[in-house]
Amino acid sequence: MIVGVSGGVLFAVMRLSPNPVLSGVAWTFTWFFRGVPRYVLLATMGTLGILFRQGLGLGVPFDWKLMELFGINGTMRFATLDANSLFSGLFGAVLGLGLSEAAYMAEIARAGILSVDKGQAEAAQALGMSGGKTMLRIVLPQAMRVIVPPTGNEAIAMVKDTSLLIALPLIDELFFQLSSIGSRTYKVFPSFVAASLWYLLVTSVLMVGQFYLERHFGRGFGQKAPKDKRFARAPGMGGA
């Protein structure tokens, strides 16, 4: 979720940028990752290691081609990572869910930024604040009132979507572990009930956190100004 929120804010700012290149890159990113189902994206991440048969290494690019060209055995790398293990494990899971969530969070953050009156940013710039400082200190704090509620919903949905990690050979995932226990003990239904209760517990904690965050960032909005009793009309006094 951290990857999704930080990436979403970044792409939201890029989408609102007057630079057509940044805006186009952000639009393409949100268009692609919002359109591809998460299960398909995770399954693709699990097989992404096929594209890197020689692994991911730090050294001379395409070193194996150079070695074949000169007929030399060995590599010109300082370190090598197994791409299959990398993309089919925790890294692939975080990358797949994070990129997908960033696309949705980009639209949520963009809507929150647009909800802030433009006069706020203009006033900050008139005081000499830079664009980045205006965004961090003026616009985003006010936009949080709009951003927090859908972000809480996305966090809850993200927790539930971790069950889709069964598309990856990630044996540490909750649903996979409980399904394996049910298959070994031939008690599938109790395992599914246990998984449901665990997900319900985690999402309930997130709902409580969402409630307090909404109350914190919603302070001062939608409240009527208190009446000053000093200027209240005396009984029996009518208007002119």
Predicted regions and their residues:
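Transmembrane alpha-helices and adjacent helix-loop boundaries
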Residues: 1-240
